[in-house]
């Protein structure tokens, strides 16, 4: 299979490293255009999240790693950056994507957000028309497989999102969060999820909002609102500050923060962004603790049974996709045979149609339904060959069937 991927994730790259691989939507579109027009790939899909940046290719005619280095890192990338990239091809890539959708390769084992991110990556590729039928089918199959795993196997135990994990770990380490004052900087999906989890714990929560987005914002019920430009006026009295924006500049910097702190008060800052929202030097302040998302990762312990069951179920979807991939070039031949059989059926039943007392509209409807039924029956039988024959055998049989069908057409005429 000429399917491949290249990328980095939290396993190979630290937060500091992952910052260099972050791709905006505009940058993703620019890269996809080059992959299609310059590297002549049949299709591509780009997945860019806080924990991973991956490019998926169909029919790429050059080195995946070289393509990634040139388009994402640039020619002046350090060798250490190049060394953390991972390439997967063929069966390995297909199996990896199936597992990825289930959360097996996520920091929070079994988390659900990766499935949403796969859907969004696929939809963006559709919207900008840089996905081909192969990657379309692969990602749809992976999404379907992940949904099946989620409903059939309990691979996640309790916390299936980063915000949930953060809340649980903060309670474990620092005690009850009831009544704690929290500021969430950022009104995107992660910010809203974090706010909702904090509200569930009966925290007093405020979210920042940029003035120009005020009318479009979705604020979880129970949360207060703070204008983004006024955030420093409120930070001083907060117990916890969470930052989850897509900004490429710091939302909290050391010089501003150290001047607004209250004497004798300790602060807990949680950075949920890549690139980071909180200036690293803030950690130098003695009364401040800064956490990043890597701190809250969940180790995979005692998951052998769930992993075995998941992989066994996923193997069915992997095989299903591989069969489709091998058979896809024969679909037009199957359609041709089905159409010929439909025409023959229609010709053979002409006298029967005329002998039945039906109106013209009823006769046309009956004729159309019979033709459709004939097409479906033939297609189903022929596609069933995939289960009993090798691909080369299927090709030979289809060629023979097509020739036979055409001969039948000649005799009917």
Curated annotation (Swiss-Prot):
Substrate binds at residues 49-52, 106, 111-113, 117. NADP(+) binds at residues 186-191. It catalyses: (S)-4-amino-5-oxopentanoate + tRNA(Glu) + NADP(+) = L-glutamyl-tRNA(Glu) + NADPH + H(+). The active site is at 50 (nucleophile). One of its GO terms (molecular function) is glutamyl-tRNA reductase activity. GO terms for biological process: protoporphyrinogen IX biosynthetic process from glutamate. Gene3D superfamilies: Glutamyl-tRNA reductase, N-terminal domain (3.30.460.30), NAD(P)-binding Rossmann-like Domain (3.40.50.720). It is an enzyme of class 1 (oxidoreductase). During catalysis, the active site Cys acts as a nucleophile attacking the alpha-carbonyl group of tRNA-bound glutamate with the formation of a thioester intermediate between enzyme and glutamate, and the concomitant release of tRNA(Glu). The thioester intermediate is finally reduced by direct hydride transfer from NADPH, to form the product GSA. This is Glutamyl-tRNA reductase 2.
């Amino acid at each position: 299979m000429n399917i491949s991927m290249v990328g980095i994730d939290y396993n190979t790259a630290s937060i500091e490293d992952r910052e260099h691989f972050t791709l905006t939507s505009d940058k993703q579109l620019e890269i996809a255009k080059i992959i299609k027009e310059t590297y002549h790939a049949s299709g591509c899909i780009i997945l860019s999240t806080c924990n991973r940046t991956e490019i998926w290719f169909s029919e790429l005619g050059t080195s995946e790693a070289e393509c990634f280095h040139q388009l994402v890192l640039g020619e002046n990338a350090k060798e250490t950056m190049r060394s953390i990239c991972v390439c997967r091809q063929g069966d390995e890539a297909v199996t990896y994507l199936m597992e990825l959708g289930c959360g097996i390769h996520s920091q929070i084992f079994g988390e659900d957000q990766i499935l949403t991110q796969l859907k969004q990556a696929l939809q963006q590729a559709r919207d900008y028309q840089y996905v081909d039928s192969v990657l379309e089918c692969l990602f749809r199959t992976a999404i379907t497989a992940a949904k099946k795993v989620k409903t059939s196997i309990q691979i996640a135990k309790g916390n299936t999102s980063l915000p949930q994990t953060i809340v649980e770990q903060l309670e474990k380490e620092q005690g009850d969060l009831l009544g704690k004052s929290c500021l969430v900087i950022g009104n995107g999906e992660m910010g809203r999820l974090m706010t909702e989890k904090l509200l569930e714990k009966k925290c007093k929560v405020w979210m920042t909002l940029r003035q120009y987005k005020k009318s479009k914002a979705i604020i979880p019920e129970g949360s207060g609102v703070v204008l983004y430009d006024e955030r420093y006026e409120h930070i001083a009295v907060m117990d916890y500050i969470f930052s989850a924006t897509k900004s490429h500049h710091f939302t909290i910097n050391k010089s501003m923060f150290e001047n607004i702190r209250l004497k004798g008060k300790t602060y807990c800052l949680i950075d949920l962004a890549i690139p980071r929202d909180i200036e690293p030097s803030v950690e130098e302040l003695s009364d401040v603790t800064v956490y990043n998302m890597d701190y809250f990762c969940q180790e995979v312990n005692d998951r052998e049974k769930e992993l075995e069951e998941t992989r066994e179920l996923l193997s069915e979807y992997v095989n299903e996709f591989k069969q489709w991939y091998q058979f896809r070039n024969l679909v037009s031949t199957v359609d041709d045979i089905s159409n010929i059989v439909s025409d023959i059926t229609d010709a053979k039943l002409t006298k029967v149609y005329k002998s039945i007392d039906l109106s013209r509209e009823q006769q046309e409807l009956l004729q159309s339904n019979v033709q459709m039924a004939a097409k479906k029956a033939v297609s189903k039988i022929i596609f069933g060959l995939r289960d009993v024959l090798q691909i080369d055998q299927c090709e030979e049989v289809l060629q023979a069937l097509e020739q036979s069908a055409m001969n039948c057409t000649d005799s009917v005429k």
